[in-house]
Amino acid sequence: MKKKRYYVNQLALYKHDMQNTWKVLKQAMNISKNKSEITEIQFNDTIVDDVGNMANIFNKYFASIGKNLAEVIPPSTKHFSEYLGTQNPSSIFLAPTYREEILDIVSNLNNKKSPGHDDINNFILKGVISSIIDPLVHIFNLSLSSGQVPAGMKIAKVIPLFKNGDKLSVNNYRPISLLSTLSKVLEKIIYIRTIKFLKLHNIFSNFQFGFREKHSTIHALLNFIDKVAHAIDKFSHLVGIFLDFSKAFDTIDHEILLYKLSHYGVRGKALEWFRSYLSNRQQYVFLNGHASSMQDIKFGVPQGSLLGPLLFIIYINDFCRSSDVLSFILFADDSNLFFSHNNPYTLVSTINAELDKVTQWIRANKLSLNLQKTKYMVFSNSLNTLPINIVFDNTPLENVSHTKFLGLIVDNKLSWKYHIDKICKTISRNIGIINKLKFHFPPSTLLTLYSSLILPYLNYGILAWGNTQQTSLNRLLLLQKKSLRIIYNSAICSHADPLFIDSKLLKIGDLYQFNLGQFMYNYNRETLPHVFNDMFPKNQSIHSYPTRRSNELHLPLCRTVFAQNTFIYNGPKLWNSLNDDIKASPSLNTFKNKLKSFLLNSYSNAQNN
């Protein structure tokens, strides 16, 4: 009984944490971690099993990735600085840190993160912070004022993590970098000041959705849907090119990055600080309890760092300037290009000409593409096969019918068939887990598992795919009903609406409406990324004369059913249908509670009728 209560409490604690939920479930189901040590690898056609030699081989391989890629990049006809535009005349000032700021940063550190080479974990730091806060304030302020980063904060402890394929090949492992806890605190201090400055001066491209506050993969996906819908509604053909950069974070050129930082206003001591931060970095591999020798890191942004992602999006911020014709959607290194035209021959010739320009930007910035993994897709109403052949850097690209894009499987008809197949497969497996545990846990705990093992797959990207064909959505609804009947131990043929009401869970169709309502609430509160500004004007701004519905959002004219099924049309339609009490909610949480109650009430009303 005590053990059962422990698992119930743990699952409740990790309700919204998928990784830790799985850990608890594996404990409860007596599933071993099966985390075997690396016992041998292949190097120069020889099997190596000495742990010290293996650690050194791994370290040399990881440290050489950026250098090896940089050496084979052809020269560009352009200089990287030609793409940067007007220089920011303002310069950043690194204001000193203070006790309260450091205490706040430390208190928000995740206790479960592994320590770096100094073996000081976040839990220990939190325990002693009050005793060392004054020396830390002094050290960090000395770093800011001198433009120097302590050498001990520039060492990474690297753990090789197997991905897939042949376990003997070092190519099939990725490095997990663990940094000093104190370096993370210093990075956070710098991050706060840098991001505030860059936002103040509107440095970032509107088409960069990665690693930015109030920007997410969902916003990038909706921007993509918007482009496809507008093209198809105009009876044009749209080509999407899904780029695959080779080890982009590892190949960043430090001198180019520092030049761009200066261009955007990071100068003086601040620029010296970043130069110190990037230079003389070292790493070692820790394998099976043994440490390798040190290797210098001369390329890339520090993996596992807070500043790394920020520095990366600064580095590629001007990528959109490589073409004035193509549209861009960027999510860190997940970059995608789009162009539409009603004439397929003009479409192809324009894209291929513009891709030559994009190639020059990539070369000038010393990045490289994996052209075997870079694909393109044609979105069109045409039933005929279009004569479209796309060439990138003298290499013909593969035309695919579907591909993975920001966590969704996108197909060229946007039917979402492949993605829903994947969701159904994952949810079915997880329902099996809930079924195994139904006699060991009460319904309340099983509902927690539903929130961890089923709901995230239904919620993710639903604004993109959630209004697809009803036959596809019915497959998901049946799985929802099946899971609730298992949780409540109800008969297979029992009516499911009371179960949705009791659990306060929404059916898949209403889950789409719930997410769409939140998007529209944020639109009306002007908290969405800039690309959505003025997307849904009010009727009063369309008509020159007053109408009964002047304050409602204007419903766009959609020529195709495809466009009418997207958020472009359904967003304003839903918002106009909501009562004023829901729309006037003072906060997003209040709005969510009211909208959810409204949607759940429809189940009760359906029962009563």
Give the ranges of each region predicted by the language model.
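Short linear motifs embedded in intrinsically disordered, charge-biased segments
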Residues: F43-V48, T471, L477-N609
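Catalytic palm subdomain of template-directed nucleic-acid polymerases
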Residues: K247-Y264, N336-T359
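Basic/polar low-complexity segments
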Residues: M1-T97, N522-P556
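Basic, alpha-helical interaction scaffolds
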Residues: E398-L463
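Short, conserved micro-motifs composed of acidic
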Residues: I92, A353, S368-S401
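Short, conserved catalytic/metal-binding micro-motifs enriched in Asp/Glu and His
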Residues: E40, F62, G66, V106, ...
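Active-site palm subdomain of RNA-directed nucleic acid polymerases
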Residues: I190-Q208, L238, P309-F339
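Conserved pre-catalytic core of RNA-dependent polymerases
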Residues: F62, I92-P302
